[in-house]
């Protein structure tokens, strides 16, 4: 399960690895109104992600790492949404991993400097979708899931006691 964290629009995407390819199972956005108090928005994110986790039973949750720009208020809201997602995962025994935006773009497009449109198109191509996924928050979450899926075999090796090649952020 991939997560594109945000307090107003949190993207989620669920993929399954089938042999050498990935298949999209679900994707969408948890929307909250900016008119609601932040605690109500975070509660809704937690509740809806908890339901999605119970439904899909993911083996892992991968989140886009917080990018700290100039807007501290926005960064705090994204951090709170990430925390709600991680709590929902932890309460159901699902391990969480984080990836930088550059690592996600590189995993999906081959370049950490890829634009949003390029990521959206590549997500559609990699998942065999007839069109690029929308909205963009859902596409970004699917990109996070694809990124983690590319690293998942390394995690399995590391879990068996053999050092992983490369590494997972976590």
Spans of model-derived segments:
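Phosphate- and other anionic-substrate recognition elements at nucleic-acid/protein interfaces
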Residues: 1-170
């Amino acid at each position: 399960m991939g997560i594109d964290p945000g307090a107003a629009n949190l993207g989620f995407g669920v993929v399954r690895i089938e042999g050498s390819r990935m298949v999209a199972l679900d994707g969408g956005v948890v929307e909250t109104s900016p008119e609601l108090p932040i605690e109500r928005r975070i509660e809704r994110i937690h509740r809806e992600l908890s339901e999605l986790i119970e439904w899909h039973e993911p083996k892992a949750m991968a989140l886009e790492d917080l990018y700290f720009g100039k807007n501290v208020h926005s960064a705090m809201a994204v951090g709170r949404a990430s925390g709600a997602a991680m709590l929902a995962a932890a309460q159901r025994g699902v391990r969480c991993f984080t990836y930088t935006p550059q690592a996600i773009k590189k995993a999906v497009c081959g370049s950490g400097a890829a634009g949003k449109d390029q990521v959206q198109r590549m997500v559609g191509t990699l998942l065999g979708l007839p069109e690029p996924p929308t909205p963009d928050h859902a596409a970004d979450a699917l990109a996070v899931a694809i990124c983690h899926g590319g690293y998942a075999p390394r995690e399995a090796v590391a879990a068996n006691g053999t050092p992983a090649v490369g590494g997972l952020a976590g």
